[in-house]
Curated annotation (Swiss-Prot):
This is Ribosomal RNA small subunit methyltransferase A. PROSITE patterns: RRNA_A_DIMETH, SAM_RNA_A_N6_MT. It catalyses: adenosine(1518)/adenosine(1519) in 16S rRNA + 4 S-adenosyl-L-methionine = N(6)-dimethyladenosine(1518)/N(6)-dimethyladenosine(1519) in 16S rRNA + 4 S-adenosyl-L-homocysteine + 4 H(+). GO terms for cellular component: cytosol. Its main location: cytoplasm. CDD domains: AdoMet_MTases.
């Protein structure tokens, strides 16, 4: 996974260079937190707390809060701000490099006594940096077994792609992968004025309930993930031409015919269920 690079001696005012626009709408922040539901007995992981607009509400409500912030200055400020709260942990780290299972196993102070007897599923929340949204989502999908659901804010255009249906202009690899692992629900949209500095786009809050469809589709995780990347590899090409990169031409043609797909169809027009059928057909013999 690619990693974000923090600038040395970075200042909060320059955080936008890392793709961060700080949420400044108090009512919007509260609305996002309320989308998590009752978290009095839950562990919440916040991605990119920034100046703490969402964190303030989480700290008062969550049984345990782990806020992951890459910016050294912001992390230090947050650590000082919540130093007296035993349920809050500020982790200065790149979220793309964080192993969720390792973080959850670490208990500090009196929290050591709260270690569960079986793995807990956490709730994720965050205003995701625009330029690494896809990378963060893929990282979360990898850890789907540890996550209950995520409430995330992303660029509206990206939200449209995540929730897009097959056969529509926005449907692609991000749509298929998101819908393979989660049930996607659009909650609400915030205007540019809700942030500082104000971005040039609207932002949409999504709820991603982890509901992996791997077993129902009869596919293996690693293989099918790679298959999706293959068939969406070059959007201008037909599904058949993308398959030719990895499969014999005759085998690809026969498999498509066997599952009822025309040779000129494009991957974005094929439903996830049909894509899984094609994948399994190609695995035969």
């Amino acid at each position: 996974m690619p990693k974000m690079a923090a600038e040395k001696n970075s200042k909060p005012a320059k955080k936008a260079k890392l793709g961060q626009n700080f949420l400044s709408d108090a009512s919007g922040a509260l609305k996002i937190v309320e989308a998590l539901g009752d978290i009095s007995d839950a562990t919440v992981v916040e991605i990119g707390p920034g100046r703490g607009a969402i964190t303030d509400h989480l700290a008062k409500r969550a049984k345990r809060l782990i806020a992951v912030e890459i910016d050294r200055v912001l992390a230090a400020q947050l650590r000082l701000r919540y130093s007296r709260l035993e349920n809050v942990e500020i982790l200065e780290a790149d979220i793309l490099a964080v192993e969720l299972s390792t973080v959850l196993a670490q208990r500090i102070g009196p929290l050591r006594d709260l270690r569960p007897t079986k793995p807990e599923k956490v709730r994720i929340i965050g205003n995701l940096p625009y330029y690494i949204t896809s990378d963060i989502l893929l990282r979360l999908f990898e850890a789907h077994a540890l996550i209950d659901f995520a409430v995330i804010m992303v660029q509206k255009e990206v939200a449209d792609r995540i929730a897009a249906k097959p056969g529509t202009r926005d449907y692609g690899l991000l749509s298929a992968t998101s819908q393979l692992y989660t049930h996607v629900e659009k909650l609400f949209t915030l205007p540019p004025g809700s942030f500082n500095p104000a971005p040039q786009v609207h932002s949409t809050v999504l709820k991603l309930q982890m509901e992996p469809k791997l077993e129902a589709l009869g596919v293996d995780e690693e293989g099918f993930d790679s298959f999706l990347k293959l068939i969406f590899g070059q959007k201008r090409k037909t599904l058949f031409n993308n398959l030719r990169v990895a499969y014999d031409m005759a085998k690809a043609r026969e498999a498509m015919k066997a599952v009822g797909l025309k040779s000129d169809v494009r991957a974005e027009a094929v439903a996830l269920e049909k894509t899984a059928q094609l994948y399994n057909e190609l695995r035969k013999g």
